[in-house]
From Swiss-Prot:
Organism, scientific name: Methylobacterium radiotolerans (strain ATCC 27329 / DSM 1819 / JCM 2831 / NBRC 15690 / NCIMB 10815 / 0-1)
Residue ranges annotated for the 4Fe-4S ferredoxin-type domain, each copy included: 52-82, 93-122
Protein name: NADH-quinone oxidoreductase subunit I
Coarse class of the protein's main subcellular location: membrane
Function as written in the Swiss-Prot or TrEMBL entry: NDH-1 shuttles electrons from NADH, via FMN and iron-sulfur (Fe-S) centers, to quinones in the respiratory chain. The immediate electron acceptor for the enzyme in this species is believed to be ubiquinone. Couples the redox reaction to proton translocation (for every two electrons transferred, four hydrogen ions are translocated across the cytoplasmic membrane), and thus conserves the redox energy in a proton gradient.
SUPFAM superfamilies: 4Fe-4S ferredoxins (SSF54862)
High-level lineage: Bacteria, Pseudomonadati, Pseudomonadota, Alphaproteobacteria, Hyphomicrobiales
PANTHER family: NADH DEHYDROGENASE [UBIQUINONE] IRON-SULFUR PROTEIN 8, MITOCHONDRIAL (PTHR10849:SF20), NADH DEHYDROGENASE UBIQUINONE IRON-SULFUR PROTEIN 8, MITOCHONDRIAL (PTHR10849)
Residues annotated to bind [4Fe-4S] cluster 2: C72, C102, C105, C108
Catalytic activity: a quinone + NADH + 5 H(+)(in) = a quinol + NAD(+) + 4 H(+)(out)
């Protein structure tokens, strides 16, 4: 063995440098949070549970253009459009999302011309059966009604970058 290797092993250089590193982090603030009791910050572009939004007058925003269905890479969205109404607009009769297939990429949200389908701030939506992850139009509208305030705030914060 060379002299420098003997000196390193006798002086425990690696052990001492590890202890110094550990002590440096010991006195810094914690980097973790106690999750169920503390919530971390979620930015305005956070992608959580899907929601269908309504206009302030209560009418649903979706115009049945089917762009979200076409762009979805996982083919998780199924839409059926109703007949045209007297004013020339269409609405959906069926809007289903298979949340098991969804990869939360946000492309449906980007493709929507009227901001009808969004990925909201909710990420705590665990279920016990697979069938509960098949969202229909009513479930999506309820999510939109429940999270509308946060969704509108996030869209407004992100608007300059769109």
């Amino acid at each position: 063995m060379k002299l420098d290797q003997v000196a390193k092993s006798l002086l425990l250089k690696e052990f001492v440098s590890g202890m110094i590193l550990g002590m440096r982090y010991f006195f810094k603030p914690k980097a973790t949070i106690n999750y169920p009791f503390e919530m971390g910050h979620r930015g305005p572009r956070f992608r959580g549970e899907h929601a269908l939004r309504r206009y302030p007058n209560g009418e649903e925003r979706c115009i049945a253009c089917k762009l979200c269905e076409a762009i979805c890479p996982a083919q998780a969205i199924t839409i059926e459009a109703g007949p045209r109404r007297n004013d020339g607009t269409r609405r959906t009769t069926r809007y289903d999302i298979d949340m098991v297939k969804c990869i939360y990429c946000g492309m449906c949200q980007e493709a929507c011309p009227v901001d009808a389908i969004v990925e909201g701030p909710n990420f705590e939506f665990s279920v016990e059966t697979r069938e509960e992850l098949l969202y229909d139009k009513q479930k999506l509208l309820l999510n939109g009604d429940r999270w509308e305030r946060e969704i509108a705030r996030n869209i407004a914060m992100d608007a300059p970058y769109r």
